[in-house]
Structure formats: C-alpha cells, structure tokens
Regions:
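C-terminal/domain-edge helix-coil "capping" segments
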Residues: 24-72, 157-249
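Short, solvent-exposed beta-strand/turn patches at coil↔beta or beta↔helix junctions
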Residues: 38-52, 287-321, 339-346
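Periplasmic peptidoglycan-binding/anchoring modules of Gram-negative envelope and division proteins
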Residues: 52-71, 303-336, 361-365, 403-417
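A short, hydrophobic beta-strand-centered structural micro-motif
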Residues: 60-61, 75-80, 106, 113-155, ...
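N-terminal segment of the mature soluble domain
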Residues: 69-122, 161, 366, 371
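Periplasmic OmpA-like peptidoglycan-binding domain that tethers envelope proteins to the cell wall
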Residues: 87-103, 273, 306-309, 338-417
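Alpha-solenoid helical repeat scaffolds
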Residues: 225, 256-261, 293-294
Length: 417
C-alpha cells in the first residue's frame, strides 16, 4: 500500500592635465572591506546542582517581580510544574513546588501562597507556572541530555501579563524524573492544546508579554484537572472520577488529561465497560489530532508484550478499541514503532519495525476491514520524546507505538521497508 506524502567597492576617478596638453588619468580605489565577523554565539549556561539551580531561578523570579499597583499582600497560586516536553508531573517537579513554597513563606512574605482552585482563580491571583526539561546543554540536536532547563514564570491574572521570569540549568545528578502516578498510568500521549498553552506561557514569553490566551481561557479547568490528579495519586479514584466528569462539562474541558483521567479512574474502580468507552474517546481525540502514541511495553529485544500482567492486562482491549475506532472512521493509519537509544541503531531500527508489524497484524485481526489500510514502519531511536536513556518509567514514551493518520492510496502489503 502506498501513502501520499560582496562587498561593494567604491571607486573614485581623478582626472588631471599638464601644461603640455597631455592628459593623464589616474584611478584609485578604496580596498574592499571584509564582511563583519559573525559574532560568536554566547557560551551555554553552566549547569549547577539542582538545589542551587532552583534557588537561583526562584530568587530571580520573586526579587524581580513587577508588582506595581499590586496590593500589599499578593495571593500566589502554583499551577503544578510539568515536564516541558511530555507535560507530565514528576517527583522532580513536585520537589520543585515544595522548595518554592517553603522559600516564599520564609523569604517573600508579601506573597501569600493559596491553593490552586477555581475559587482562588476567580480572585485573579498571581499564578506561578514552570517547566522542567531534560536538554543537551550545548543545544546539540540529538545530543545527550546532560542538563535540565528550569523555567519559572509569574502570570498576573488581573492584567493577564507575565510579570517575572526565572531560568537556570541544573545538573542531572540526583534528579528523579519518575512520573507521578496519574501520568505513569496514562496509556496515551497526544498533542494537547491545554498543555501546549501552559508550556508556551512559560517558555515562549518575556516579562511584559500577554499570557497565552488559550492558557487563560482554560485555567479554571486546569484547577479541576489538578484536583483530579491529586485524588488519583492519593488513590481516591471515586473522587477523581467525579472531578474529571465535572471538568468535561466545563468549557475547555475536553482535553487529553481529562479523557485519560476518566479512563483511569473507571479502570481502577473495575468499571470495565465505562473504562473502555472512555478509552475509545481517548483514541478519537488522538486520531483527531492526527497522531496517537500508546505505551505498549515489550520484552527486551522482543515483539512480545512484557510478562507483568498488571501492566499488560488492558493491552488487548486497547488494541480492540484502536481497531474499532480506526475502522469506523474509514481512514488509514501508519503504525510506527519507536525505541530508546539503548543498543545498536541498526538493531533498534529493525526491532521497532518488527514491533510495529506485530501491532499492525493485531489490529487487522480485530478488524478485517483494516487490511490494506495500515502500514508499519520503524523509527528506532531517531524520534525520542524524552531522550534521557534511563529505560524506566520516566522515558517510557521513547518506547511507544504511534498511530498516525495517513492518506489512503492503492496497492502494497503495508509492511515496513
């Protein structure tokens, strides 16, 4: 099956003549000026230990805050910090929040820390947002992730402007990027406008800029999402489900975290039918954005799912739902396998392709109408999302299988090449 896919020199002429009437012409020119030397890029910032890096960013954030016109006491809420690529909360981002809260209470008494809730947001507080992102410190694309970028921002929701920024680089030693339970358990990763707007508001702004409008429009829903995540992480699955269902009814509530939350809470409550109905909506959301990444975990070096039944138990139901939703849309899919960077690139390329083939075959077994509408490809480790090479829960997305909407063509057997 085929898929549609100098310097300008300035010359001065001088004419002279002699009494004998013999004319002589002389021409002189200024030498061509060499082009100005290209300024060398500034050296990358020097990463420092995590504690020092966070303290620098946080102190810069609060000491430089533009509080002109603000009351003597400023209400501050923290919209939970996230990974700047995956959007996940983690042990590291939770630690950042704890350290920042303690710093504010001890050193910046003008700021009064309040809970992130719909009631507090209604009072137009100052909101602290932040991202924590693994990066190559020299900015080399595909280079080793040898630092973490800390980005903090204060958004005044009264004026809808950014009133301060704080940034720094941290060494990776001692940092625990293990995702919080909700994000660790979430089966699906897809492009999500709400998470993108949060990241843009932190990373894509400077002091004085307006808060991203999509972030401002969804901040009430974000507070509900946070309530749901906290309830899920605490094991209060019934409470989490109630919150997510309420969020779905709120403007801007149809977002990936909410849909994942409805699925996860129902699954934990052993409400299988409701869980799979919710998973179908997760699949629809991902396919609508043209790409859906599912965390299928395989045995090392194998095309077979891992043996841990507690993890792989829902895999068959996921495959059934992906096949059902794809068949119903009468569309075509590219099934793309990915690996982390561990191992030889050639082996990773082959293994990721074989895993994609396996998933493709399973989908076609579920829905015969998909035969001729799927193609399997392997990307190896060339499109890692996290890229830290830890090979644990923190970079599980690097070992994902993606379903990418593709135009339908004719012919071919759909095998990877």
């Amino acid at each position: 099956m085929n898929f549609a896919q100098g310097s300008l020199g300035l010359f001065l002429c001088i004419i002279t003549s002699s009494f004998a009437g013999v004319a002589a012409e002389a021409q002189t020119s200024t030498p061509a000026q060499p082009p100005p030397a290209t300024a060398a890029p500034p050296p990358p910032p020097t990463p420092v230990p995590f504690d020092a890096a966070l303290l620098k960013a946080a102190n810069d954030l609060f000491t430089k805050a533009n509080l002109n016109g603000a009351p003597d006491k400023v209400t501050l809420v923290i919209d939970p910090l996230i990974d700047g690529v995956t959007g996940a909360q983690s042990k590291a981002t939770h630690l950042e929040e704890q350290r920042i809260t303690a710093l504010v209470k001890s050193n910046y008494p003008r700021f009064q820390v309040a809970r992130f809730s719909a009631e507090t947001i209604a009072k137009a507080p100052v909101v602290l947002i932040g991202t924590f992102t693994a990066a190559n410190n020299a900015g080399v694309a595909g280079g080793a992730k040898d630092a973490y970028r800390i980005c903090l921002a204060l958004a005044d929701m009264r004026t809808k402007t950014i009133i301060s920024k704080g940034v720094s680089r941290a060494l990776p030693e001692g940092i625990d990027p293990t995702p919080a339970a909700f994000f660790n358990d979430s089966p699906v990763f897809a492009k999500d406008a709400s998470t993108d707007s949060y990241i843009k508001t932190c990373q894509g702004t400077k002091v004085g800029d307006n808060v991203d409008q999509a972030y401002a429009d969804r901040i009430v829903v974000a507070s509900l999402v946070n309530d749901g995540i906290e309830a899920y992480d605490d094991g209060r699955y019934r409470d989490a489900l109630d919150v997510y269902q309420s969020a779905l009814k709120t403007p801007g509530g149809e977002q990936l975290r909410v849909l994942n939350g409805v699925y996860l809470a129902n699954y934990k409550l052993h409400r299988t039918n409701a869980a799979m109905e919710a998973f179908g909506k997760v699949v629809d959301y991902g396919l609508k954005s043209d790409k859906l990444a599912v965390k299928f975990l395989f045995k090392p070096g194998s095309t077979q799912f891992i043996t841990d039944r507690s993890i792989r138990a829902p895999y068959n139901a996921w495959l059934e739902k992906v096949a059902e939703r794809t068949a119903a849309k009468q569309g075509c899919l590219e099934v793309v396998g990915h690996t982390s960077a561990t191992g030889l690139p050639a082996i990773n390329d082959r293994l990721s392709g074989l895993r994609a083939d396996y998933i493709k075959d399973r989908l076609e077994d579920e829905q015969r109408s998909l035969r001729g509408r799927l193609i399997a490809t392997g990307k190896g480790s060339r499109e890692m999302i996290v890229g830290t090479g830890k090979d644990d829960a923190s970079d599980a997305l690097d070992r994902r299988v993606e379903f990418k909407v593709a135009p339908c063509g004719g012919g071919g057997n759909g095998r990877s090449t």
